[in-house]
Amino acid sequence: MALIAPSLLAADLARLGEALETIKATGASLVHVDVMDGHFVPDITVGQPVVASLRKATDLVLDVHLLIERPERYVADFVEAGADRLSVHIEATPHLHRALDLIRGRGAKAGVALNPATPIESLAEVWGEIDFVNVLTADPALDEAAFIPASVAKVRAASQAREEHRLGFVLQVEGGVTAANLEELARAGADILVVGSAIFKSVDPQTQLSTMMRKAAGMGLTSKV
């Protein structure tokens, strides 16, 4: 099955249980959780206790995105809380190797996230240590951020780097993803598309998610996580 990763950041945080049920009902296998600290990004969202509660409530794969400063200080806590996949920002730490080693050492999949202005070439020193790359195609924020069309070229560059260096990382895209740009991103090489507002701000989130999953399936997106 094609993989769309619904982002809980766009859901009603007082009704996360219902959001999980909606996701599960569509057959989706992964849910995305954004953790913001108010320093690396202006907003504050959820922490380890919420991730732990989500873990108790669902068997969906928990894809946790740390938008926090010095993430290496907290990766062990989030893996212990139940994160199956954990991504940290290259811009947020001078100790990226350490952060990735800590994640993988705890048994989770290790990813690196890149802000829109950060070039894909910045990952050259850690290509062999990452399980997935999360390319942000909008500036991270609680409010719905505008999709940056120029980011498609970066997705394509990441896909080309994977082929050239014979790497096995999964290519994930997050930020302003909608049914309108899903096809373009898939053709650029995206394996996983993180979708928030386009699902949870719609009139019928379950139907919208199902529709996007069917469209992604037609594009041949990967089901690997």
Label for each model-derived stretch:
Residues 2, 140-141:
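A short, mixed-charge helix-start or loop-turn motif at secondary-structure junctions
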Residues 16, 88, 135, 195:
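Short beta-strand and adjacent tight-turn residues that come in two discontinuous sequence segments
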